[in-house]
Amino acid sequence: MTTTEQRLTVESRNGIDYKVADLSLAEFGRKEIRLAEHEMPGLMALRREYAEVAPLKGARISGSLHMTVQTAVLIETLVSLGAEVRWASCNIFSTQDHAAAAVVVGPHGTPEEPKGTPVFAWKGETLEEYWWAAEQMLTWPGEPANMILDDGGDATMLVLRGAQFEKAGVVPPAEDDDSAEYKVFLNLLRERFETDKTKWTKIAESVKGVTEETTTGVLRLYQFEAAGELPFPAINVNDSVTKSKFDNKYGTRHSLIDGINRGTDVLIGGKKVLICGYGDVGKGCAESLAGQGARVQVTEIDPINALQALMDGFDVVTVEQAIGSADIVITSTGNKDIITLDHMKAMKDKAILGNIGHFDNEIDMAALERSGATRINIKPQVDEWTFDDGHSIVVLSEGRLLNLGNATGHPSFVMSNSFSNQVIAQIELWTKNDEYDNAVYRLAKHLDEKVARIHVEALGGTLTKLTKEQAEYINVDVEGPYKPEHYRY
């Protein structure tokens, strides 16, 4: 038995495997799930539409996505459409423990007799625990998983890298400059290779497709595709308009402020704020902070995004130009080493540093931890780091997603858009698998419009309907799609 397995064991009750913080939190979680269902019209509409068809019957979906109340509604939607599901979070801090408990117990179970879905997630996992949970999510009794629903690409990477190393006959040793997380990842694969030399290959051969939620995970998928290492089709959910233009912007506009307020409770008005990156997420960050009266500056590598920022009223600067005067610094790029140790040392005393990109390497936390700076934990996911010269900075969520670590993430309504796309993408790959090659696809425009239409109606909007003559004049169908694929919205 390995070190990890000695400390971490799967619990099982009434035939349901799980590892969560506390099943007694299930009633609280169920109350919040019921409220969330009211705010997630897209998912509820899909339940009604497909209730009698069960299009996901036979699907064994391994899901790696933030285990929140909103995700609970997604999971139970997948189950209502016929799927079997196993779940883990895609972030060590993002799990809402009451939501995880409620999903395990299910709407008709009790903590003593759960009747829900296997979940392996709790808030505040170590890296070792995180990857252990990911393996449990992908490890099914009997037949292996045949679908993956991913956020950030960790589940997909675990399967594909595991299969790749099995084919090579060896798991490579960690390099000195590898991140602490990658070393844990390799160690898990090495331990598993000692006991089962074909585990990941079997899963990779069984999986019919993956649907990916976020920018970072999509990048990984395109890298696998370019290298000829993608053994199944993938749908890029992130670039559906009703995801990227809503979740990424409007969701961030709501949840960034929530995370900063809960983490620090500082007045934002009047503060100098530096936003690194002006993509859809960065736009939401800048808009929310400017709305609070902050003086916002933006960094960008892309002249088009930089011009957008300037036209929106934000100065475009480099990190080096602004880091010494910023009161709050937020990274939102999807890239690495955006804020280095030298940048952190140059920050003002008690300046706040946070990240809202998917991974923790936008801020070089590894270098900060090695620097000799003293860390004092103020409260969960809020740390003060003091340098040798006596000045300090406040780091939120250890450089990971602050909106989920310090708060509860995006609100239900905007996640209904994103998760409706996920459900539709899962149905698409499961029911029409032979129509897809081993490549990365986006959802068809008419499906994007379907998701938007549901939510327009839920907000009380009334769409104008084209006449037949008007539709012919602009060369579209009366029922859509209304825009070409290259339209940017």
Swiss-Prot record:
Leading EC class: hydrolase
Alphabetical GO biological process terms: L-homocysteine biosynthetic process; one-carbon metabolic process; S-adenosylmethionine cycle
GO CC, any one term: cytosol
UniProt-listed Enzyme Commission number(s): 3.13.2.1
InterPro entries: Adenosylhomocyst_ase-like_sf, Adenosylhomocysteinase-like, Ado_hCys_hydrolase_NAD-bd, NAD(P)-bd_dom_sf, S-Ado-L-homoCys_hydrolase_CS
Subcellular location: Cytoplasm
Residues that coordinate or bind substrate: 68, 151, 213, 243, 247
A GO MF label: adenosylhomocysteinase activity
Cofactor section: NAD(+)
Pathway in which this enzyme or protein is active: Amino-acid biosynthesis; L-homocysteine biosynthesis; L-homocysteine from S-adenosyl-L-homocysteine: step 1/1
Catalytic activity: S-adenosyl-L-homocysteine + H2O = L-homocysteine + adenosine
Key words, A-Z: Cytoplasm, Hydrolase, NAD, One-carbon metabolism
Binding site for NAD(+): 214-216, 248, 277-282, 300, 335, 356-358, 403
Bound cofactor: record note: Binds 1 NAD(+) per subunit.
Family as reported in the entry's similarity comment: Belongs to the adenosylhomocysteinase family.
Role this protein plays: May play a key role in the regulation of the intracellular concentration of adenosylhomocysteine.
PANTHER family, sorted: ADENOSYLHOMOCYSTEINASE
NCBIfam families named in the record: ahcY, PRK05476.2-3
Protein name as catalogued: Adenosylhomocysteinase
Taxonomic placement: Bacteria, Bacillati, Actinomycetota, Actinomycetes, Mycobacteriales
